[in-house]
C-alpha cells in the first residue's frame, strides 16, 4: 500500500480569540510583566503545537510562532540590527522597538509579504556585523521536543531574506555569501539537537526574476552540501509556480510546491519528469490562503497523480496557515454557508482525512467531508443580474477642468492638510460598539454616543487647524469588515481574525454570494459631521479592489466579476453621499498593489481590471465633487502609471517608513494630479518633530508640483492614542503653516 505523510508550513499566532494580541498589547501598556507575557505566549505556543499533533501531522513546524514577525526574528538571529538601534541587548524589547519605533528612533519599514495582507519588518543592512546572536529557533525546537512533538524548524532562506532587505554597500550576492556560514551554524545546531529536517522558506524563487537568482541560489545550497547539512534541508516555495527543474537540481532533501495558486503549472512540470524522485515532494494541496473547504475528491485525484511521479510524498497546505483564522468551532454560522468553510484547524482535518484514506484505507472522515462539500456546491449563490454597461467609467471632464471647479467650491489653502480617515478607537468606543452589537444598549444610546464622539473630534480637528476633516469612523471596527456587514453577499464571522502586522488583527469578511448595495452605508454619520463645521468633511469609503483583496473571495465566479459587483455597490454609496451634499469623497484602495500577481505576465490584466473597477465606483460624480483615494506603501514603481490612470483628484500614499525611497518612483512620471505623500509614521507611538515633517515636505516637493501637493499622515489613526494623535497633528499643521510663509 502506498503511504503518504502530512505536514504543515505554519500555524496562526493570534489564538482563537486573539490571546496573542491581547497579551502583547497588555505588555506594551505595562499592564502585565515580561514574565506574564512570556507565560501567556508559551501557553499559546504549546496549544498550537498540541493541536497540530492531535491531527496526526507527521511533522509540525516551529519557528512560525513569533512575538511580532518571523522576518524580524531572522534579522535578530543574525544580528542584522538597524544602525539606530545598535548597542543594545538583543531581546524582546529591542525587537518591539525596531518594529514600532520609540521616542528616539523611527521604526523599520513595514512591507507586504508578497501578494498577501501580511506585513513584514524590512531588514536593514547599514553598518551591520552579521553573526549568530539570538537563536530563539533552537530554543523553540527544544521546547517542542519537551512536549514530545515531532517538530521541524522553519526559517526564511538566505535568498529570500536578503532579497527582502534593504541598505548596506554590499551587493545582493555578497550579502548572501556573508550569511551562509551563519545559516550553516544555525542548521548544525538544529541538526545536533535532533531535527530530522529543516524547512527553508524561499518564496522569492516563484517570482518573475527568480532566474536571476539561480546562480547564487546554487552557490548557496552547494555550500550547504559541502558543509554536510543540505540533505536535511527542504526548500519550500509557495504563492505561485516554481522552476522545478532548477530546484530539483539543488542538493537538498526535499522540495515544497504550491499546487493551489500555481495555475496548474507545477503539476505539468511534475508530469513532464522535472522532479528528481530521489527527493521528497512536499505538495501544497490544501489552500492556505482562503477559507473554503477543499474539494476533497479532487485532492484525492491530485495525490494519485503525484504518487505516480514520486517515491516519497508529503501533503501539506499550499502556504503557512498564518493567512486564515484558527477555527470554526466558536462560530455560529448559517449551515448553507458554514458547510463550505474551512479555517486552519479544519484544513488540518482535511489533511488527516486524506492521510487516513491512503494509509489506512479509512474513508469515514473522507466520505463525511466529501458529502459536506457536495451539499454546499449544490446550492446556488448566483441570483442577480448586473448592468455594468450603463455606469460611467470616466469622469465628465479632464482633471485640469475639474480642479478649477473643486477649488472654487472648496477654497482650500496652499498645501492643504487632512488625515486619512480614522481616529483612535478608544476602549470606550470599542465597548459601546460591542454592547450595541450584543444588544446590551439601544440603537438610540449607541447613535447618541457616536454623534458625541464625532462632534468632539470635529472640534479637535478645527482647533488643530486641519483643512479637510473626517468624521472619524467610530462606527467601524475595520474598513472592510464594516462594508461586509452592510452589503448583500458578504458573511462576517465572530472570531475569524487573521494577523495583518504585529498585533494588528483584521477580520476579513467572506464573499459567498452576489454583492449588492441595498441602503446607504455611511451617509448619516458623514452628513452629521458636515453639519457641525463649515470646513469640508470627507465621505470615507473602501474601494472595490481593496474590499476584494481584504476579503476571503468566492471561487465560483471570476475575480473580475466579483470586483465589478463591489464597484457598482460602492458607486451607489458615492452617489448617495454626493446627493447628501458631501463635497469630498475618499475611496480608499490601500490593497491595490498587494494584489498584484507575482508573475508579470498577469500584471497588465490585473491592473486593467483594478483601474476599471475603481473608475466604475467613482466616475459618476459631478466635476465639482473631489474624489480622493489612499494607498499603503509598497514598491509602486511597477504600478505608478496605473495609479495615474485611476484619475483620482487626490491620492494619499503611505511613505514615511520608506525613508524617501518612494519619492524615486515619481522621478520617471509627470504626476499631474493631486497627491499627498505621508509625512509621518502612524504605526509608531513616536511624535514627529516639526523639522522631520518639514524635511518630508521639502523632499516631496522636489518631485511634486506644490499646487498639487497635500500634507497628511501616512495612514489612518485608529490604532494610536488620542494624545499621540493630537500632538502629532499639531506638529504637522504648525510645520505646514511655517512652510506657507516661505
UniProtKB/Swiss-Prot annotation:
A family per Pfam: Meth_synt_1
Residue numbers annotated as active site: 683
GO BP: methionine biosynthetic process; methylation
Recorded metabolic or biological pathway in which this protein acts: Amino-acid biosynthesis; L-methionine biosynthesis via de novo pathway; L-methionine from L-homocysteine (MetE route): step 1/1
Cofactor: Zn(2+)
Keywords annotated in UniProt: Amino-acid biosynthesis, Metal-binding, Methionine biosynthesis, Methyltransferase, Repeat, Transferase, Zinc
Protein name: 5-methyltetrahydropteroyltriglutamate--homocysteine methyltransferase
Organism: Staphylococcus aureus (strain NCTC 8325 / PS 47)
